[in-house]
């Protein structure tokens, strides 16, 4: 029964996610990105030399792989894939890049009504995670994302709105899920966000990632020299 439930969750995330995300991009067209004329690390004020040393070292490969492995165990097989937690238990999923209005309805429903927890092997949220928002929020949304995924780029902006609109009831956890078959640059970019974290903690991690999503054209369009 547990395996069947996990497969159902994974299928829902993949199929519905593709349909919704595709519809959003068809409606909005290509996601525009500003011209990049200097590395993100320099733009946000990092020590560029230390950043580049970190990035070349590969020291965060295991950390990113741990995120990927946890996503696979939870049933993730596409991005973005998100799980809604209440009291530490998974009570809903957000398949793909759903719009703000739909996510808000889900949140309101979960806050008002008791939900039967879903059967999934999602790794519990811990201090090792990158969290945005109130750490004591009633609801935590755990997202698995690929930094070169165009759907993830759209959803990243949506999730910022979700946290802002529902503060202090909702927090956002970001976990890496680069898909090398589609976006071979995404894993290295994930390492870059962790190197930013190394210099400035959680706040700088989010600042770097926000800028990366802002400037990347997606689908491997960001040059490595601009990290």
Question: What does each of the following model-derived ranges do?
Answer:
Residues 3, 7-15, 19-79, 83-116, ...:
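Cysteine-centric redox/oxidoreductase cores and disulfide-bonded domains
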Residues 73-78, 133-137, 165-167, 185:
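Extracellular/periplasmic catalytic domains that process cell-envelope and extracellular macromolecules
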């Amino acid at each position: 029964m547990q395996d069947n439930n996990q497969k159902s969750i994974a299928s829902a995330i993949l199929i519905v996610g593709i349909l919704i995300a595709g519809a959003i991009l068809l409606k909005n067209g290509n996601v525009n990105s500003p011209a990049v004329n200097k590395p993100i690390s320099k733009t946000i004020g990092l020590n560029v030399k230390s950043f580049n040393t970190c990035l070349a070292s590969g020291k965060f490969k295991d950390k990113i792989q741990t995120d990927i492995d946890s996503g696979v165990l939870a049933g993730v097989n596409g991005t973005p894939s998100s799980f809604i937690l209440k009291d530490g238990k998974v009570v809903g999923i957000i398949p793909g890049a759903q719009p703000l209005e739909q996510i808000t309805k889900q949140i309101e429903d979960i806050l008002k009504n008791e939900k039967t927890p879903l059967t999934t092997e999602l790794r519990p949220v811990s201090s090792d995670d990158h969290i945005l928002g109130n750490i004591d929020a009633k609801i935590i949304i755990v997202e698995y994302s690929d930094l070169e995924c165009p759907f993830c780029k759209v959803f990243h902006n949506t999730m910022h709105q979700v946290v802002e609109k529902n503060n202090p009831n909702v927090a956002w956890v970001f976990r890496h899920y680069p898909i090398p078959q589609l976006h071979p640059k995404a894993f290295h970019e994930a390492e870059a966000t962790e190197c930013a974290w190394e210099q400035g903690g959680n706040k700088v991690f989010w600042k770097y990632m926000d800028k990366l999503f802002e400037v990347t054209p997606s689908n491997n369009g960001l040059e490595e020299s601009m990290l």
